[in-house]
Amino acid sequence: MKFISRFFYAFVVIIILFALLYLSSVYYLGIKAQDSINREIALLRESSLIEVTGYHYHRGWFRSEAEATVRLRPSVLKTIHIGRFPSVLKLILQRPVHLKTRIWHGPLAHHQLLRAYAATEVVFEQQAEREIIKFFAIGRPFHIQDTIHLSGAGKVDFTLGSVDYKELSGIQIRFAGLWGELSYQKDYKEYVWHLKVPKFFMRLAD
């Protein structure tokens, strides 16, 4: 009987120690996940194409949330001659975009041995979202997933839906969608792009 009692107590102690170890690892990886996401935002701030106008990160124990507000830089809009674009496309490109990210962190995030897994929802302002539906048939056609390994390296997968748009003025836009993958080393010291870019056709107004 004493043997059974000792075995039971030892089993309980092992379970408690395992639970504490797991909770500690989840908390620690939550800190490291925030470091990784903050680094990605810092890289966006350094971009010559995009400016970050707002950023907030809320860290939880098992899951965290981040939100960044970005927009194309005025110099980019000038370079692409935004004034010649269709009015709906001008509205979309000139307005800020909200990147709402949910981050799952821990040794078994997304059923894998990871630092974190992040899924980002690209949210346009309400007026722009209504116009986007005219192009993509859905209001949120852009999807991003970020898989961060324990080492800090990882990959970002993103997809953009297809477009088939026409106006009576003669404007036409056809685009078969976009798929891409960015594989990166820790702190983005090295990274490689893999893009699948289909044919793009656009006819502007005369």
Residue ranges and their predicted role:
Residues 1-6:
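Positively charged n-region of N-terminal signal peptides that target proteins for export
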Residues 8-26:
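Hydrophobic membrane-insertion alpha-helices, especially the h-region
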